[in-house]
Curated annotation (Swiss-Prot):
N6-acetyllysine: residues bearing it: K28, K50, K51
The organism of origin for this protein: Human immunodeficiency virus type 1 group M subtype B (isolate OYI) (HIV-1)
Name of the protein in its database record: Protein Tat
Core: region residues: 38-48
Biased composition range(s): Basic residues: 48-57
Chief location bin: host cell
Modification Asymmetric dimethylarginine, positions: R52, R53
Region of interest (Cysteine-rich), ranges: 22-37
Short motif Nuclear localization signal, RNA-binding (TAR), and protein transduction, span: 49-57
Length: 101
């Protein structure tokens, strides 16, 4: 390797930049022309800054939203409405009446 001038900034070192400038073309030839273009264009990986998304602000009338939630009917319990104790008794009765011997 050739010695690098220590006064040069690292991004200006020879070989630090691709020989041809990157462009916005996404054709196969441009996507595969160097490793940087392949990762950015071909694989879609970019490590740049991500823009912060603004969170949606709650409406000013937040109390009415709480009231509308309380008016909704309570969710129905799933499963056997009689309860788990009675269903166990049913299973016990069925096993007694069906002898497998």
């Amino acid at each position: 390797m050739e010695p690098v001038d220590p006064r040069l900034e690292p991004w200006k070192h020879p070989g630090s930049q691709p020989k041809t400038a990157s462009n916005n073309c996404y054709c196969k030839r441009c996507c595969l022309h160097c490793q940087v273009c392949f990762t950015k264009k071909g694989l879609g990986i970019s490590y740049g800054r991500k823009k912060r998304r603004q969170r949606r602000r709650a409406p000013q009338d937040s109390k009415t939203h709480q009231v509308s939630l309380s008016k909704q009917p309570a969710s129905q319990p799933r499963g056997d409405p009689t309860g788990p104790k009675e269903s166990k008794k049913k299973v016990e009765r069925e096993t007694e009446t069906d002898p497998e011997d």
